């Protein structure tokens, strides 16, 4: 440009204001962090609390800013030792204070320049210039106030300087000025009031220009309501008309910011209050609106006390002091209720706005101003509440507790989301607006200017050209717009045209200023939507009010009608990083961590609340399902039978038991059940959880639905285990069928959650139910598989071994036997077909496999004991094996055998366990046949078509597959695996094989002893014996098959040998005359038939060759005849 160097337009006011304002925020951030660090014992510089330096610190503070190092060696001796560390660790603090001093110098220099240039300020005309000027004044004032609040400032500066003096022999060059500044600004406002006397006119002019903006922004809710503020539907005919104003940027200017300008501005240029009624009016209005102002973040300034303390000492200010006291009373009495009503209005206004824009996003173009006004108004009210609730000066706190604050924040977030989502819609609208209307109007205005210097003309022509060149195609092509240069040029132009000697005075061309302010707003709608959202709706201040933030969240969750808005709190955590500044990078990590921890906590609490509601619903549904269990209809059946036989057993007046389903009958629609309330609360909370799929917080992605999924998995796991009602002391456990009913009820409720939240509940089922099929879950806790396995092994089967329970093949169940001590459970209710199928449904193939393996482990321990007994009798058994055709010799050898009863007892236990396993396997097969019939039939085909010449390893693999599907196999793979692990290193394979052969011999020759047992009587009704010896058939076949598979022997040959020995031994008792010995001879004979029937390797023809069939037939006749006579 061609102007002289000394001209005011060359002072670069725009650039300096921009840079100093940004630097001021950075300095505030650093000073704030120093204040907080000094206030926290953990973060405080260690030298300030070091006992060894205490006397030195006190001395330095007392003498500050003077430096005396010569005569105080004793007090400063410790300082001498640590001088290098002090220099190193306090440098950041010291030079921050130096930076504040330099910032103060630059601000004072700029303020003097502005005064010298006699700059014209009017917020409605040169908005950017006036705003930046007022911002600078307030930032400067705030910085000096915050500095004065650091109690340790003298100690830090003094310590550093003394360490510098001791190290370098002289004070730091900045220290004299810095020390003097600290002393001068002990009472910063008083000092600044003197300092601002020369700047009074400029500052008061700028402030008084707010009379066109502040009073109409600071209205009551009733006035807003009457004006139908922010309503798009109040005048449908104008809905598509662009929202216009002569003061566009003032419409969304923060009320909080204006109040700070007015309060601090008129404290600094207080003379205007006495001379200008407009100034006094603004001052009073601001004092009546709040009791405290936000200095920076959570640092507040109590307006009335500070102003009164300053004015009370000024002569002739009694009237102003009285004004302050009156305004304070008014603020305490009415401000709370006024702001409460405003928040109430804004809730409904923002809801309407968000709803209309969601339906018609195209309205974001013409009505963008309404959106940013709404956001700004709501943000101001929320910040006001947050600040005042934390600094209440009134006994009644009702006005400062807003349980509906979440709703207001939610609608703000909804509007923000609309702006982000439909940004291209707004860009498209305003690109056309700028090129088709703004450029034309501005061009006309420029053409009609009477005087327009060359420089100003060039700038304005560039504006017109920039706007004219815009097209919709640029938006469609995704071109990135950048109008920052244009906005800075307008800022410069404001500075050039607002000085007193300007050829083109903006004060004389207000229309130009207003038009350009509108154009600047339109450019921001194209390239700065994100920045606009931060400017109008940033709520990062919540980061510094953690306790209030958490309290608001808890209140939101406690109120069912507000829980749908609880997602607002995690969403606010996304704002936190916007409060950081590049001049203080070290706080980014701290604020980032706080945002992450708060977001995590909020989402976790929301998920927990939803989980608890779901659990309550599940509990109710489980109770309702329980009412439908067959056991509950016994009383109804009994009453029906009695009624039919005309027996009156019930007492008169006995209330009739409610039938299931009564809860669904409503007398009227106003009746609300507990379940209704739970469903309503859940749907509200789930709306919140489902509101956003994910959110970004400090480069971390949070997915609210995953929190719910995780909590549901944990709770479902605990609930399933809890519903087993396993009591280790009393050994009580829920029946599998009842547990299955409860689990299905629980799963039905969980499936219904998919109607509320888009979560994959099938994944939850798969994760949880698959874990329940294992011994332990992912947290190392016992599962229903381990609980039921332990119960069946340690409780049910142990009582079978003790003779209290018998296996009834006819019923395919274990049944209690009459004993002196009644059992606490009915075995049939846990082991019949329906219960075993329910168990299979619950445990699945994996769980049933674990159950089988546990059973096999018990069998293997019994076989190990049997082998020991065989080893003890190995010589006798070897002889008996080859002497079965010598009756006398066999009798003599038999008498030499030991532990015969123990062998039979252990083999019976093995048989019982195998019988239980066959029940479980059969149930598993039935269940899988329903679920996967085609797969089961394929496995069955595999098993049934194994060629005889197939390698045993291949056959065992097929058997393992078949066993996993619940199919019976010739050789039990699980039993083979269990017995294989018993191989002893000290015994050769040949010896092991011999022991296995002799074990079968031992069992065969021991069988006749069973006939003498009273309990060995066969019962046709149960198709077995009460002492479970019928289970020997299964034990003998399965053990033989497993052992001779392991030792690669012929199973068929060994079983033939067993049959020969057993039949020979049993035929002998036919010749016995002792009735005691032959008491249940016929019942024992039947065991041979059972063994052959059970075996895939033996045939009836083979039995016929060893044991006359006529004996078997007679035995059956005898036992049936005996059972008829005993029952008669």
Swiss-Prot record:
Residues 651-665 have a biased composition (Basic and acidic residues). Residues 640-665 are annotated as: Disordered. It holds the Pfam family Nckap1. One of its GO terms (biological process) is cell projection assembly. It is a single-pass membrane protein. The chain crosses the membrane at residues 995-1015. This is Nck-associated protein 1. Belongs to the HEM-1/HEM-2 family. It is found in: Cell membrane; Cell projection, Lamellipodium membrane. InterPro entries: Nck-associated_protein-1 (IPR019137). Keywords: Cell membrane, Cell projection, Membrane, Transmembrane, Transmembrane helix. It comes from the Eukaryota. Part of the WAVE complex that regulates lamellipodia formation. The WAVE complex regulates actin filament reorganization via its interaction with the Arp2/3 complex. Actin remodeling activity is regulated by RAC1. Plays a role in neural tube closure. GO terms for cellular component: lamellipodium membrane; SCAR complex.
């Amino acid at each position: 440009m061609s102007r002289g160097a000394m001209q005011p337009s060359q002072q670069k006011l725009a650039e300096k204001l921009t840079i100093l304002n940004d630097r001021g925020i950075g300095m505030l951030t650093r000073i704030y962090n120093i204040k907080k660090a000094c206030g926290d014992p953990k973060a405080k510089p260690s030298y300030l609390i070091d006992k060894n330096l205490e006397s030195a610190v006190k001395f330095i503070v007392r003498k500050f800013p003077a430096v005396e190092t010569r005569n105080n060696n004793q007090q400063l001796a410790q300082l001498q030792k640590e001088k290098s560390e002090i220099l190193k660790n306090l440098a950041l603090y010291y030079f921050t204070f130096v930076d504040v001093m330099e910032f103060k110098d630059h601000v004072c220099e700029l303020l003097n320049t502005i005064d010298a240039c006699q700059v014209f300020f009017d917020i409605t005309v040169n908005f950017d210039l006036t705003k930046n000027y007022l911002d600078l004044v307030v930032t400067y004032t705030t910085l000096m106030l915050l500095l004065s609040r650091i109690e340790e400032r003298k100690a830090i500066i003094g310590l550093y300087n003394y360490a510098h003096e001791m190290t370098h022999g002289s004070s730091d060059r900045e220290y004299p000025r810095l020390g003097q500044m600290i002393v001068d600004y002990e009472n910063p406002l008083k000092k600044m009031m003197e300092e601002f006397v020369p700047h009074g006119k400029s500052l008061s002019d700028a402030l008084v220009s707010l009379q066109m903006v502040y009073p109409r922004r600071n209205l009551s809710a009733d006035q807003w309501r009457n004006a139908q503020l922010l309503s798009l539907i109040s005048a449908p005919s104008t809905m598509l008309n662009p929202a216009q104003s002569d003061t566009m940027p003032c419409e969304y200017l923060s009320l909080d910011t204006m109040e700070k300008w007015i309060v601090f501005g008129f404290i600094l240029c207080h003379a205007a209050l006495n001379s200008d009624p407009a100034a006094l009016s603004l001052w009073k209005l601001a004092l009546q609106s709040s009791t405290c102002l936000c200095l920076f973040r959570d640092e507040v300034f109590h307006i009335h006390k500070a102003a009164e303390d300053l004015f009370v000492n000024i002569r002739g200010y009694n009237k102003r002091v009285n004004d302050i006291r009156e305004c304070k009373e008014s603020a305490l009495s009415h401000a709370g209720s006024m702001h409460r009503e405003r928040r109430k209005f804004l809730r409904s206004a923002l809801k309407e706005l968000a709803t209309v824009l969601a339906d018609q996003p195209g309205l974001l173009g013409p009505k963008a101003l309404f959106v940013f006004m709404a956001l700004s108004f709501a943000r101001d009210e929320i910040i006001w509440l947050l600040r005042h609730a934390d600094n209440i000066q009134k006994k009644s706190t009702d006005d400062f507790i807003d349980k509906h604050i979440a709703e207001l924040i939610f609608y703000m977030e909804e509007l923000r989301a609309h702006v982000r989502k439909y940004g291209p819609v707004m860009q498209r609208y305003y690109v056309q607006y700028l090129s088709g209307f703004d450029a034309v109007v501005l061009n006309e205005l420029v053409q009609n200017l009477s005087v327009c210097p060359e420089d100003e003309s060039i700038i304005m022509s560039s504006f017109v050209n920039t706007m004219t060149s815009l097209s919709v195609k640029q938006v469609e092509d995704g071109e990135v717009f950048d109008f920052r240069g244009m906005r800075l040029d307008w800022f410069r132009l404001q500075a050039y045209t607002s000085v007193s000697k300007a050829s083109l005075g903006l004060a004389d061309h207000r229309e130009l200023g207003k038009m350009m302010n509108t154009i600047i707003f339109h450019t921001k709608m194209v390239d700065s939507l994100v920045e606009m959202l931060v400017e109008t709706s940033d709520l990062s201040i919540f980061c510094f009010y953690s306790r209030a933030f958490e309290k608001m969240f808890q209140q939101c969750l406690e109120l069912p009608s507000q829980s749908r808005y609880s997602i607002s709190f995690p969403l606010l955590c996304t704002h936190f990083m916007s409060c950081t500044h590049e001049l203080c990078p070290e706080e980014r990590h701290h604020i980032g961590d706080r945002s992450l921890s708060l977001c995590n906590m909020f989402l976790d609490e929301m998920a927990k609340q939803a989980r608890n509601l779901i659990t309550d619903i599940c509990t109710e549904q489980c109770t309702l399902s329980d009412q439908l269990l067959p056991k509950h209809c016994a009383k109804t059946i009994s009453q029906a039978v009695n009624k039919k036989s005309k027996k009156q057993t019930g007492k008169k007046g006995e209330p009739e038991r409610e039938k299931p389903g009564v809860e669904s009958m409503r007398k009227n629609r106003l009746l609300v059940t507990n379940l209704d309330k739970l469903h309503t609360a859940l749907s509200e909370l789930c709306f919140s959880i489902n509101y956003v799929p994910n959110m970004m917080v400090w480069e971390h992605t949070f997915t609210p639905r995953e929190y719910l999924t995780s909590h549901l998995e944990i709770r479902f796991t605990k609930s399933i285990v809890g519903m087993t009602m396993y009591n280790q002391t009393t050994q009580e456990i829920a029946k599998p069928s009842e547990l299955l009913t409860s689990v299905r009820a629980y799963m039905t409720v969980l499936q219904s959650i998919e109607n509320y939240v888009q979560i994959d509940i099938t994944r939850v089922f798969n994760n949880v139910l698959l874990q329940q099929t294992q011994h332990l879950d992912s947290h190392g806790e016992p599962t229903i598989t381990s609980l039921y396995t332990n119960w069946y092994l340690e409780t049910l089967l142990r009582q079978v071994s003790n003779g209290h329970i018998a296996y009834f093949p006819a019923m395919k169940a274990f049944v209690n036997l009459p004993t002196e001590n009644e059992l606490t459970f009915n075995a049939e209710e846990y082991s019949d077909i329906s219960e075993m199928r329910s168990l299979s449904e619950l445990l699945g193939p994996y769980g049933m496999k674990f159950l089988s393996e546990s059973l096999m482990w018990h069998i293997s321990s019994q076989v190990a004991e049997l082998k020991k007994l065989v080893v003890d009798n190995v010589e006798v058994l070897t002889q008996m094996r080859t002497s079965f055709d010598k009756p006398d010799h066999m009798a003599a050898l038999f008498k030499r055998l030991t532990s015969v009863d123990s062998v039979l007892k252990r083999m019976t236990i093995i048989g019982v366990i195998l019988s239980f396993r066959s029940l479980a396997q059969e149930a598993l097969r039935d269940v899988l046949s329903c679920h996967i019939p085609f797969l089961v039939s394929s496995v069955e085909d595999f098993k049934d078509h194994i060629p005889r010449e197939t390698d045993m390893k291949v056959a065992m693999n097929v058997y393992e597959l078949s066993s996993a599907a619940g199919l019976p196999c010739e050789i039990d793979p699980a039993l083979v695996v269990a017995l294989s692990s018993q191989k002893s290193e000290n015994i050769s394979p040949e010896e092991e094989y011999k022991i296995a052969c002799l074990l079968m011999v031992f069992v065969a020759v021991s069988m006749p002893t069973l006939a003498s047992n009273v309990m060995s009587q066969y019962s046709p009704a149960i198709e077995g014996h009460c002492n479970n010896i019928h289970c020997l058939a299964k034990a003998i076949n399965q053990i033989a098959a497993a052992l001779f598979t392991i030792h690669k022997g012929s199973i068929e040959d060994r079983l033939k040998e067993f049959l020969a020995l057993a039949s020979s031994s049993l035929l002998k008792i036919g010749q016995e005359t002792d009735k005691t010995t032959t008491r249940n001879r016929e019942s024992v004979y039947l065991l041979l038939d059972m063994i052959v029937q059970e075996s895939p390797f033996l045939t009836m023809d083979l039995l016929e060759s060893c044991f006359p069939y006529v004996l078997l037939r007679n035995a059956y006749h005898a036992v049936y005849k005996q059972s008829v006579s005993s029952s008669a």
